[in-house]
Amino acid sequence: MSNPLLSLNYEPAIQALGGDYYDEVLSAEFPQHILRFRNDQLLPKIGLNSQDVKDEHFIEAFGKFHCVRPFLALRYHGYQFGEYNPYLGDGRGFLYGQVRGVDDELYDFGTKGSGRTPYSRSADGRLTLKGGVREVLAAEILHRHGVRTSRCLSLIETGEGLWRGDEPSPTRSSVMVRFSRSHIRFGTFERLHFYKRPDLTKKLLNHVINCYYSNLKKENISQKDPFQDCYFLFYLELVKRIAKLVAQWMAAGFCHGVLNTDNMSITGESFDYGPYSFIPTYNPKFTAAYFDYSGLYRYSHQPLVCKSNLQLLQEALAAVIDRKNMRSALEKFDDFYLHEYRQLMMRRLGFKKLAEADADKLLQLTIKMLTDSQVGYHDFFLELRQKFSPEWRDDISQIFADFEQPELIDPWRQYYYHLLQTYSDNELEEMTERLQQYNPQQSLIRPVIESVWEAITLEDNWQPFYDLLQQIYD
């Protein structure tokens, strides 16, 4: 039987742009291949039936890397903690291939841990198994939260011992294949600006619009240059996408950890999960990465950092897009962000279409209560999901009746009760459904991840990992 993963109609979209954007590389050879995770939810998106794709097919395609060539290590630079770094690029992964989904959109298969490339520098090009497990979990819980995110298609343990400064070593190795819209980053354009290649910038920008913003071409009015009127609209749409993305992170209680420009996708998708963390309690100063000594990428700073990264990108795009137009587009970021964040938080609280003033007051009271009480951020929303009852509209005493610090929740409780008075019986039932939909049963705070990893590393017990994934999906 032929391998369905190798029989896909791979589309060389990046390769067709030419060698200015990538280096052709080879994959590493590994001593062992154990499939630890396969994402059957993604297979229908590329026209495959999960029953037709066997475990050995994943190993052949995404562990042994048979048949599909060439592999492309993409070139990029980036601002890392505010400093420009021209020595970047895919250092432990490559673009495996691109396929057209059943929705006619273009998707990437990108590897992580597949071996050394010209951009590995002194690193080994490998991915720790713990790093792979963490990325699988991050992507799936964020997807469950409704975040526009890359996801892991497969995770294969590869039988090597790796040495890392931030993990007990030797630690186990893995190779992952990531499923995403694109691996083109802000830093991809920043590299072209660094080398003063406006021709390559325009060529890549046309490609991005064609593949990921094709709806904009229908809005252009210029006959002389079919892209000219799209460039500003592209940047405006990117501003909107990034604003919505960071609002989704904030509502989910997610702290990315390393918001360098090389970790930001030009499609506005969340990807590349390293030292991320979910906030245990509402703490604006919470920092995910142990090496972020200044707190630059702290939880509350994420919207400002994303806006700043969009501003930095203007320099790289200025050869094609008018600076004044980009500045005016970026001025809309705050409004895009606040609108999305307000809407997402109201959903988590069960409401829909509240008046803006009511929503803002409830949001203010919610954040104050979470800050003052230091109740678990995810615990609060899970408890709201589990305990909410239409009877709350008639009896305020039932609303979080057993909250340990009643004086801290009382202002919130009073206003929540006030808003319930405007809801009909049918609307209260819809609230119950929203609370179920937007508040996952499982959180992904550090102790949860460490518990899963402890079972794997001490006993090679993967059941807690699979159980956690199932709880995320439920």
From Swiss-Prot:
It is an enzyme of class 2 (transferase). It catalyses: L-seryl-[protein] + ATP = 3-O-(5'-adenylyl)-L-seryl-[protein] + diphosphate; L-threonyl-[protein] + ATP = 3-O-(5'-adenylyl)-L-threonyl-[protein] + diphosphate; L-tyrosyl-[protein] + ATP = O-(5'-adenylyl)-L-tyrosyl-[protein] + diphosphate; L-histidyl-[protein] + UTP = N(tele)-(5'-uridylyl)-L-histidyl-[protein] + diphosphate. Its EC number is 2.7.7.-, 2.7.7.108. The active site is at D262. One of its GO terms (molecular function) is AMPylase activity. It holds the Pfam family SelO. Mg(2+) binds at N263, D272. Keywords: ATP-binding, Magnesium, Manganese, Metal-binding, Nucleotide-binding, Nucleotidyltransferase, Transferase. ATP binds at G89, G91, R92, K112, D124, G125, R178, R185, D272. Its cofactor is Mg(2+); Mn(2+). The keyword Amino-acid biosynthesis does not apply. Belongs to the SELO family. Nucleotidyltransferase involved in the post-translational modification of proteins. It can catalyze the addition of adenosine monophosphate (AMP) or uridine monophosphate (UMP) to a protein, resulting in modifications known as AMPylation and UMPylation. PANTHER family: PROTEIN ADENYLYLTRANSFERASE SELO, MITOCHONDRIAL. This is Protein nucleotidyltransferase YdiU. It comes from Trichodesmium erythraeum (strain IMS101). The gene is ydiU.
